[in-house]
């Protein structure tokens, strides 16, 4: 288009001024043709900029390249152990602005993003260890798992002996111009696997080192379409905040007993549970909401039988029809199995739980009392209590059975409902415990948690009361018993309120690192809501007394062995 050429005013040096249409200048609110000063480095302002580091300089006299684009910043850390075999995947991360602390914050202001990300790896081996890792960029759509030869993709090799950081760029492979901030869609994945075993040539007790991950955006990284401050997009949630330090250090309870969590119980044989257990889709196969309320109310019914006198209390938990979650059983109905007993052979360490109900004698626990207080599926009138073997046919009635021997020389008889996760021990001072997850009542279709290599399911152990033990704790007169739950209750509540399905895929763990005074370990959460630890065949309960803090690590393939590097963290209790 023809038009009049703009005449440069006299005295205006070339390059020191430009029209507002030039990219990189401030144009908002300017009329066409308004002159805007650009960043021009002269001998006068260059020395000033260096001396003041560009702080407080006049507008647009500071270098436009912000430090968050030029500097590497800490993003993550993972552990490399001598036990990791060649091919073991130690670290994976999908391309996202969340991989850098500054782009993660800025992404909240924009509707989309595009561009690559640079990753820098620093091995904390001080040049002593031998071994190599390979970092590879895997294109979108390729499944990451055992057998994947990552060296067939663009990669770099990281030598443990090298003291220099190693950098690799993750390009942005995308079918569209930009990624939406909430759902990035198909993106590449960065994978680090073992090339050669880690070797400590001097031996000793050190068997692992840490690799620090730092990031910065590539030169082509950019955001697009700023959002209004009042607007809000649908962002994919992350499970990182589900498991925190307070949950496992005092305020957290388990989802079966609602008692304070004191340890982690590995279950190498696997387990399956559904009641108050929720998955990452925000759904459950169970029948109870993640809340505990008083469900025992005395009805005062007595059932005489010769010299035996039993008193029964029945649960007042509503009916299955009134349960909005599931009509298998009333909300809050436990997943306990039955132990029917008739005659005098009643366990002398019968169970007391869910509110610590005991038979008192002048205000103190009656040591001659034999009692069992749990709930189970039962049918029939109070005079003819029978356990229900299935949930079809006759109506399921929730019964809280609390049998009490009202005479010192009398033998109680009747249906005792014992906890499946706890064994009633023969002596009052026994402090042994064996989990029995195979006796937990489950609904049809409930997924099971099976071991994945050395990664085995874990349950969260809590101290619960025993018969006549008012203040049950470690070392109490009646010993210590432990109940186990599949999740901390705060995690159960979080899963029930949100949908984390976009954050994790089948075959992945979301991993947290637990730091102890004597070492560290990792635990992972899968899509079914089960937690795992890399404890192998060990059944030793892990005491959480020395736990210092918990740090989220991120997604990782479930085939990658979770790090277990603890020493002396299981002292203080006796277990079997």
UniProtKB/Swiss-Prot annotation:
* UniProt keyword terms in alphabetical order: Capsid protein, Host cytoplasm, T=3 icosahedral capsid protein, Virion
Supply the InterPro entries for this chain.
Calicivirus_coat, Rhv-like, Viral_coat
The superkingdom listed in its UniProt entry is Viruses
Record keywords: RNA-binding included? no
How is this chain modified after translation?
A: The N-terminus is blocked.
Q: Which Pfam families did the record assign?
A: Calici_coat
Q: Where would one find the signal peptide in this protein?
A: none
UniProt keyword Zinc-finger present: no
Where does this protein reside within or beyond the cell? Virion; Host cytoplasm
For bias type Low complexity, the affected ranges are 13-29
Region annotated Disordered sits at 1-31
Any one cellular-component term (Gene Ontology): T=3 icosahedral viral capsid
Q: Which family does it belong to?
A: Belongs to the caliciviridae capsid protein family.
Subunit structure as annotated in this protein's UniProt entry: Homodimerizes, then multimerizes. Binds to histo-blood group antigens at surface of target cells.
Extra remark beyond the main annotation: Two different RNAs lead the expression of the capsid protein. One arises from the cleavage of the polyprotein translated from the genomic RNA and the other from the translation of a subgenomic RNA derived from the (-)RNA template. Capsid protein expressed from the subgenomic mRNA is produced in much larger amounts than the cleaved one.
Give the protein's function: Capsid protein VP60 self assembles to form an icosahedral capsid with a T=3 symmetry, about 35 nm in diameter, and consisting of 180 capsid proteins. A smaller form of capsid with a diameter of 23 nm might be capsid proteins assembled as icosahedron with T=1 symmetry. The capsid encapsulate VP2 proteins and genomic or subgenomic RNA. Attaches virion to target cells by binding histo-blood group antigens, inducing endocytosis of the viral particle. Acidification of the endosome induces conformational change of capsid protein thereby injecting virus genomic RNA into host cytoplasm.
Could you tell me what this protein is called? Subgenomic capsid protein VP60
Q: Which species is the source of this protein?
A: Rabbit calicivirus (Ra/LV/RHDV/RCV/1995/IT)
Q: What is the lineage of its organism?
A: Viruses, Riboviria, Orthornavirae, Pisuviricota, Pisoniviricetes
């Amino acid at each position: 288009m023809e038009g009049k050429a703009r005449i440069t005013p006299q005295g205006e040096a070339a390059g020191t001024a430009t029209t507002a249409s030039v990219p990189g200048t401030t144009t908002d609110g300017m009329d066409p043709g308004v002159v805007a000063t650009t960043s021009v480095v002269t001998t006068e302002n260059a020395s000033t900029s260096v001396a003041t580091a560009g702080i407080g300089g006049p507008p647009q006299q500071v270098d436009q390249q912000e430090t968050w684009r030029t500097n590497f910043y800490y993003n993550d850390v993972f552990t490399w152990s001598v036990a990791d075999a060649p091919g073991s995947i130690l670290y994976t991360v999908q391309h996202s602005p969340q991989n850098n602390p500054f782009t993660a914050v800025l992404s909240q202001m924009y509707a989309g993003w595009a561009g690559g990300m640079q990753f820098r790896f620093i091995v904390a081996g001080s040049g002593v260890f031998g071994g190599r890792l390979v970092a590879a960029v895997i294109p979108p759509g390729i499944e990451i798992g055992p057998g994947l030869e990552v060296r067939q993709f663009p990669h770099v090799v990281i030598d443990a002996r090298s003291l220099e950081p190693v950098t690799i760029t993750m390009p942005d492979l995308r079918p569209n111009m930009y990624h939406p901030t909430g759902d990035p869609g198909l993106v590449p994945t960065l994978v680090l696997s073992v090339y050669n075993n880690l070797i400590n040539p001097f031996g000793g007790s050190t068997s692992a080192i840490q690799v620090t991950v730092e990031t910065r955006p590539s030169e082509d990284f950019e955001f697009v379409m700023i959002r209004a401050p009042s607007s809000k997009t649908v962002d994919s949630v992350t499970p990182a905040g589900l498991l925190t330090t307070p949950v496992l250090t005092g305020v957290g309870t388990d989802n079966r007993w609602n008692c304070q969590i004191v340890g982690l119980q590995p279950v190498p044989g696997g387990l399956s549970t559904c009641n108050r257990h929720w998955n990452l889709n925000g759904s459950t196969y169970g029948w109870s909401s993640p809340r505990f309320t008083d469900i025992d109310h005395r009805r005062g019914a007595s059932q005489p039988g010769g010299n035996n006198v039993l008193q029964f209390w029945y649960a007042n938990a509503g009916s299955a029809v009134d349960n909005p979650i599931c009509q298998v059983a009333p909300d809050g109905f436990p997943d306990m199995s039955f132990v029917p007993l008739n005659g005098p052979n009643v366990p002398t360490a019968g169970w007391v739980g869910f509110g610590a109900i005991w038979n008192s004698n002048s205000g103190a626990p009656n040591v001659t009392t034999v009692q069992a207080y749990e709930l189970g599926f039962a049918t029939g009138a109070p005079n003819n209590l029978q356990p229900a073997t299935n949930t079809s046919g006759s109506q399921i009635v929730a019964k809280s059975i609390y049998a009490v021997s009202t005479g010192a020389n009398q033998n109680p008889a009747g249906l005792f409902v014992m906890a499946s996760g706890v064994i009633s021990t023969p002596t009052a001072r026994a402090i042994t415990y064996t989990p029995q997850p195979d006796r937990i009542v489950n609904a049809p279709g409930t997924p099971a948690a099976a071991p994945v290599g050395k990664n085995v399911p874990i349950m969260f152990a809590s101290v619960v009361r025993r018969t006549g033990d008012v203040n049950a704790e470690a070392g109490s007169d009646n010993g210590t018993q432990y109940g186990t739950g599949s999740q901390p209750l705060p995690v159960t509540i979080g899963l029930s309120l949100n949908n984390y399905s976009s954050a994790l895929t089948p075959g992945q763990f979301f991993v947290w690192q637990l730091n102890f005074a004597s070492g560290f370990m990792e635990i992972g959460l899968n899509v079914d809501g089960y937690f795992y630890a890399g404890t192998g065949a060990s059944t030793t309960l892990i005491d959480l007394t020395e736990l210092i803090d918990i740090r989220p690590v991120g997604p990782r393939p479930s085939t990658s062995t979770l790090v277990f590097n603890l020493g002396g963290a299981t002292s203080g209790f006796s277990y079997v």
